[in-house]
Amino acid sequence: MSILENFDPAVAHAIRVETERQEFNLELIASENFVSEAVMEAQGSVLTNKYAEGYPGKRYYGGCHNVDIVENLAIDRAKELFGAEHANVQPHSGSQANMAVYFTVLKPGDTVLGMNLAHGGHLTHGSPVNFSGKFFNIVPYGVTKESQTIDYAEVERLAVEHKPKMIVVGASAYPRTIDFAAFRKIADKVGAVVMVDMAHIAGLVAAGLHPSPVPHAEFVTTTTHKTLRGPRGGMILCREEFAKALNSNIFPGIQGGPLMHVIAAKAVAFKEALSPEFKQYQQQIVNNAKALAVALMKNGFKLTSGGTDNHLMLVDLSETPLTGKVAEEALDKAGITVNKNGIPFDTRSPFITSGIRIGTPAATTHGLKEPEMAQVAGFIADALANVDNDAKLAEIKGRVNTMMKQFPLYSSRLA
């Protein structure tokens, strides 16, 4: 019996059951991934005990020599990974990374161009329920109805009309390659700063499988999980000229002490991402996504924009009797985890939606490849044809579990 099981069996049980879910179910949420044992060991270390307000060499607490080493490793590896002039690894999340950039560049009421959440953007790109939409004047851009890809002509027209101080680029549900150079050209035309939120595609960028935003943007933010496969957290890359202002907007601007155990885990993840194996892994993510997209379409599903260039796809259910909510719940019963998601020009509420978002990073970490993607598409089709048949969904879950047992990940934790 472990120390935790002995002291708090309720929490220990919840952790064990969640470990079983991650081990035996099929995880297809595009924003989730599974970290290595090395990353978890760093995050579960004694560094969780250390306060370290400030930055390496300039702390407000004593005893920071060891955490300075760790943070400098994370910074140097991040800069090497993305070819950036400056990196701040302290943001607790992607949202806080974005907030720090907003506060570095903007004053309340300034105009910002950001991708419409309903078209694949993110809450922090100007949603009225988020700080970004409350503090700043947001002008949303989106995708075309015909291609369901970013309407660069509309972006330029809106930029010329509204003269934004900043253009926010990036998405949380966009399956196509983003043309960062086009955004840079538009921004230069109106004198705007460019902030790219590459949270979803950071791993692909690191591996050279998606164009890098770093040469085209003053600021690049990201989460450190998702395709980057690190701990849950955030990071900001920027040009050296903005480093001092940016750092002060993280601390003391919007955060106090950094989470040094998480920064240690980030450092480990960045080392992993610098390896040749990581590039192979990212290529497999993309290969799996393309294979799954083709297999889903062969099973009769419609995908927004007709496919994918990256790690995710949006299944458009608007022409079926299903909603995203119903599909998510049925797939969950079948041992397949996805999330309901709005599609461009969706007429349903965000709580119901007309689509589901599917991603391949976590399944690829398990070791699944193209042959399994055909099976996965079959499982999804079978489940969504039987949303009201709990017995059938349970039978599909059994097949999913059987497949996943061939690809162990955390089995030592269940011994």
Swiss-Prot record:
- What would you give as a GO molecular function for this chain, any one? pyridoxal phosphate binding
Superkingdom assignment: Bacteria
Q: Where is this site: Plays an important role in substrate specificity?
A: 225
Give the classification, highest ranks: Bacteria, Pseudomonadati, Thermodesulfobacteriota, Desulfuromonadia, Geobacterales
Keyword field: Amino-acid biosynthesis, Cytoplasm, One-carbon metabolism, Pyridoxal phosphate, Transferase
Which protein, by its recorded name, is this? Serine hydroxymethyltransferase
What is the catalytic activity of this protein?
Answer: (6R)-5,10-methylene-5,6,7,8-tetrahydrofolate + glycine + H2O = (6S)-5,6,7,8-tetrahydrofolate + L-serine
Which residues are recorded with the post-translational modification N6-(pyridoxal phosphate)lysine?
226
- Going by the record, the broad EC class of this enzyme is transferase
BP GO terms, sorted: glycine biosynthetic process from serine; tetrahydrofolate interconversion
